């Protein structure tokens, strides 16, 4: 399977398309905590690739010290 091309770029302003909850990968918050609510604005600070699925993964800074890993269907351009 060929890697998907990223839809969003570093530095791009985006918004949360859905509520984003901690899946356990955000150590400063309890699992299940709301990290960003639908409509919250943020900036893509890194673009990576999920190795198993060849899908882009975006690190989005929604607030100072609140960088959340997101898939394309979880964010939208501003």
Regions found by a protein language model. Give the residues of each.
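Basic/aromatic-rich interaction segments and small domains that mediate binding to polyanionic partners
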Residues: 2-78
């Amino acid at each position: 399977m060929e890697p998907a091309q990223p839809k969003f770029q570093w530095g791009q302003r985006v918004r949360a398309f859905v509520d984003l909850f901690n899946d356990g990968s955000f150590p400063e918050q309890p699992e299940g905590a709301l990290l960003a609510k639908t409509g919250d604005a943020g900036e893509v600070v890194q673009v990576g690739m999920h190795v198993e699925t060849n899908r882009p993964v975006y690190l989005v800074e929604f607030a100072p010290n609140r960088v959340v890993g997101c898939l394309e269907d979880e964010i939208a351009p501003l």
